[in-house]
């Protein structure tokens, strides 16, 4: 094989490897964001009237775990948005505890409002990370 042909083969192979690497290499923060989004969606879609508060409690625990992993992966890069989501999750936790203690229309309404706030904060986080993922 001539040197020019060898260089062409090497260049083509290197280019293919780089393109393959670009397609599959995404930062860990992207995977943890996907987990946060999935957990937030599960929480938003929880049917309290059908499944009770236990489904919200379970979904909330998963979201907290996913958010902790996201914060670990993101370090300080998306801290304001992660803190905003964490704050709304804490508010939801309080609303859930109050609704468990006194399941009234008002306390269940507060849970629904808090779930909506969590969804909004999750969207803010997703929008902030969009350029990275």
Predicted regions and their residues:
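Sec-dependent bacterial lipoprotein signal peptides
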Residues: 1-20
């Amino acid at each position: 094989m001539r040197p020019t042909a060898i260089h062409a083969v090497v260049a083509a192979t290197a280019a293919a490897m780089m393109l393959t690497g670009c397609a599959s290499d995404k930062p860990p923060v992207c995977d943890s964001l996907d987990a946060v989004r999935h957990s937030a969606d599960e929480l938003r879609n929880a049917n309290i009237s059908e499944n009770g508060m236990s489904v919200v409690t379970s979904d909330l625990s998963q979201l907290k775990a996913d958010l902790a992993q996201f914060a670990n992966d993101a370090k300080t890069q998306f801290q304001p948005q992660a803190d905003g989501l964490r704050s709304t999750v804490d508010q939801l936790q309080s609303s859930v505890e109050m609704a468990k203690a006194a399941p009234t229309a008002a306390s269940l309404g507060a849970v629904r409002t808090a779930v909506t706030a969590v969804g909004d904060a999750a969207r803010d986080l997703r929008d902030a990370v969009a350029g990275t993922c």
